[in-house]
């Protein structure tokens, strides 16, 4: 399956009004257990490169405050919805993958693939067991969406296998795709 197949699924579900109602009462369309090749940077719409650059810079800063995403304006509504009243979140992917607090997973992945290019151990775990007690702290609603990413080199090409708990096809996918390209 490729991005075009995912797109067609969502178009068909929308046309046939096959919705799941989320906790806010909003109609959503789900595709549970999808496995596909991310061969396009967007499922719907066009990536906003200016915003992507800001989000990646924020990830690299390892700040867990959404007010640091866009110094010139408001953070995106989705981040505001997920954040505490103080702007704190759990899902800064740079913090989760590069900070010593989380064992500098990126460094370990690079070392592993440098030492053993055929390895299947080059994994980064984004989510964590403690998220059950952290996701709603101080008014947050941020249960990390990416569970884990495995990296492999095959035929001199880096392959990422991304396992998501949840991913928004309109906004989230574009930014997650860009993050994996940066990684």
For each predicted feature, which ranges?
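Terminal, non-catalytic protein-protein interaction segments that mediate quaternary/complex assembly
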Residues: 1-182
């Amino acid at each position: 399956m490729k991005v075009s197949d995912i797109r067609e699924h969502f178009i068909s579900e929308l046309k046939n009004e096959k919705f799941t109602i989320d906790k806010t009462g909003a109609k959503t369309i789900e595709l549970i257990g999808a496995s596909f090749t991310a061969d396009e940077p967007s499922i719907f719409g066009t990536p906003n490169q200016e915003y992507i650059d800001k989000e990646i810079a924020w990830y690299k800063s390892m700040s867990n405050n959404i007010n640091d995403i866009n110094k010139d304006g408001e953070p995106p509504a989705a981040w505001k919805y997920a954040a505490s009243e103080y702007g704190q979140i759990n899902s800064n992917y740079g913090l989760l993958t590069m900070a010593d607090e989380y064992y500098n997973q990126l460094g370990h992945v690079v070392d592993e693939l440098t030492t053993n290019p055929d390895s299947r151990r080059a994994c980064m775990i984004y989510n964590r067991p403690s998220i059950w007690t952290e996701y709603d702290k101080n008014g947050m609603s941020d249960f990390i969406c990416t569970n884990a990413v495995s990296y492999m080199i095959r035929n001199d090409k880096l392959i990422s296998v991304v396992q998501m708990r949840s991913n928004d096809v309109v906004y989230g996918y574009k930014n997650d795709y860009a993050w994996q390209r940066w990684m």
